[in-house]
Every structure is written in structure tokens, then in C-alpha cells.
Regions:
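Small cysteine-rich, disulfide-bonded extracellular modules of the LU/uPAR three-finger superfamily
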Residues: 1-63, 67-102
Length: 102
């Protein structure tokens, strides 16, 4: 079974490897602002990104890109940004867990 040190190493590796975030409008990907990557009190790695498109649009996906340029996480959303919205906050939570298989 993994030790607490191993779990901490996995969490910190995720923190180090997430390099940027993107969102998609239609079929076009745009970079968004990566606000923070933290380990919460519940030992969840939380990655927050802020989307500011500048004009009304419908955002249909968000994703996280590793420092190697690989997509590490992606999720479908359906958020309409109107003129009254300045930005959209999205986050990904990663819970590292172990289970024993008999």
C-alpha cells in the first residue's frame, strides 16, 4: 500500500506538471489564465482557471495541458458568456486514492 509520502509526491507532481489551461468556443481553442494549483485540506489537487473571452460566446469545453504539451484533463461544459460577464471561473479537482483489489 502507498504511504502518505507517496500520495504527497503524486499530488505535487500534478501541481508541477499542469502548465496551462484552455477553453473552446465552437471548434477553436483559446488559452485561459491559470489562476492557481493548490492541495486542499482534504488532499485534493485543485486547479483553477479563469476564462475571459471579451465578447459574447458559448464555451463548450475546458482542458488542462501538461508541461509536455499533452492534454491531461478535459471536460464538456455549456456556458454562455454575455456582455455582462467579465470572466468565468472553472476548476478541476483531482483526488488521488488507492483501493485494494482482491
Amino acid at each position: 500500500m502507498l504511504t502518505n509520502a507517496a500520495f504527497n509526491d503524486f499530488r505535487n507532481m500534478i501541481k508541477r506538471m499542469i502548465a496551462r489551461a484552455q477553453y473552446r468556443v465552437g471548434s477553436t481553442w483559446y488559452d485561459s489564465t491559470l489562476l492557481e494549483t493548490v492541495i486542499t485540506g482534504d488532499n485534493i489537487v485543485r486547479v483553477k482557471t479563469q476564462i475571459a473571452h471579451g465578447s459574447p460566446c458559448t464555451i463548450n469545453r475546458v482542458r488542462l495541458i501538461s508541461s509536455n504539451g499533452d492534454v491531461w484533463a478535459e471536460k464538456a461544459i455549456n456556458v454562455i458568456l454575455e456582455n455582462s460577464y467579465t470572466h468565468l471561473l472553472q476548476w478541476f479537482d483531482f483526488n488521488i486514492a488507492e483501493s485494494e483489489v482482491n
